[in-house]
Amino acid sequence: MSKSALPKRLIEIPEMRRIKSIHFIGVGGAGMCGIAEVMKNQGYGVSGSDIKESPVTKRLQSLGIEVFIGHDSKNIANADVVVVSSAIDRENPEIQAALKAQLPVVRRADMLGELMRYRHGIAVAGAHGKTTTTSLLTMMMTEAGFDPTYVIGGKLNASGKNASLGESRYLIAEADESDASFLTLHPMAAIVTNIDQDHMDTYGNSFDKLKAAYIQFLQNMPFYGLAVVCGDDKELFDMIDDIGRPVLTFGLEPHNNVQATNVRVDGTKTHFTVLRKDREPLELTLNIPGQHNVLNALAAITMATDEGVNDDAIKRALAKFAGVGRRFEQQACVAKDDGDVLLIDDYGHHPVEVAATIKAARASYPERRLVMLFQPHRYSRTRDCYDDFVAVLSQVDVLLLLDVYSAGEAPIVGADTKSLARSIRLRGEVEPVVVDKDELAPVMQRVLQAGDMLITQGAGNVGQLSQQLAANNLYL
């Protein structure tokens, strides 16, 4: 039987024994809400809690999921199992109540692994590009009629959601390396987009331990599984012999199994040609900009082709791809004096990701001045990538810096926003402006000019400012 015929089989997923009701602590998080939605659609009773109301919690409530705002031991009264995100402290009253009641308390990745247990799981890992790659692969397989279940770390703009329960044997999901929880997954196939020095505290500040974790992740596949890795990434390429599983590589270099050539940017679209062994060249148009997104698309194309997705479905998926929330997302053009300001919001929070955003913005809108409002994410990342941040942020025309979004970390001396601004100023390419979020309006009014593009950049709450701008020109 061909692979393309396999997904036509509808599957029956065994129920989790004795588990009827699931409670998610931190249900509004990007990684948690999708699993909660899928479990609800599978017929389980689902509840959740979060510290504040958000569009995500409101949407979950509209699906019939009971969401409590605030954490309280009473919230788990009807639960048979409690799922927690890595951001939740062990002293949380709901966790303590669950332990006292002898309920299982499991990590998000454990529940994702349970979803994957009886399915043909495809996991997407890597330092950068996971969400976009997962989304593109989901679109390709959906266009081909595979009807996969998917759990993505960002909202698919086309569907307005980041998870869906399909009827086929396929499950496509992001695999999170930040807390090493991706090691709990046992997929049938996996993509690694790249490897970089991020979340190093998890790995004892050892790059060798980080690389070993990726190898273990890929070795969690069965011996007949497939590893799709970026052959342009030297660290990944050097690891191939240690994987011990079938491997296909993708990239821009000719040694790869799947290669992109003739890459051209045309506004917000990217055109390129895909070369694959024993196939005719495939001319494609990707409906988002950036060479980094060509690599993301190649990763998805490589996996989709191996799974039996036809070229027409790949073409349609790339041409209609509307992007992912907070990934170079164009919010609006807002009026400014006798012109406008283009608002772009991006989640990237690592120097490599910020550099990719800047490159894509320059290529797409070369006539616009690039103003970036950057919010550093975590003191540890600012410390570990300090010199790279200084170099990358110096490439913009106007730089506004918000305080570090701590994500629960204690401040680190020399890794704060003022130190970062001082080093950028000494480099001499751009004059950074440190600004308090509550005093942003007058600074924006003074700095922004007609014809600018303003990029709100970071993984914290900076994206909310872009939404406010798009809604009512708050700072213009």
UniProtKB/Swiss-Prot annotation:
Pathway stated in the Swiss-Prot or TrEMBL entry: Cell wall biogenesis; peptidoglycan biosynthesis
Keyword Nucleotide-binding: yes
GO annotation, biological process: cell division; cell wall organization; peptidoglycan biosynthetic process; regulation of cell shape
Major localization listed first in the record, in broad terms: cytoplasm
Molecular function as annotated in GO: ATP binding; UDP-N-acetylmuramate-L-alanine ligase activity
GO cellular component: cytoplasm
Record-stated family: Belongs to the MurCDEF family.
Protein role: Cell wall formation.
Name of the molecule in the record: UDP-N-acetylmuramate--L-alanine ligase
Lineage: Bacteria, Pseudomonadati, Pseudomonadota, Gammaproteobacteria, Moraxellales
Gene: murC
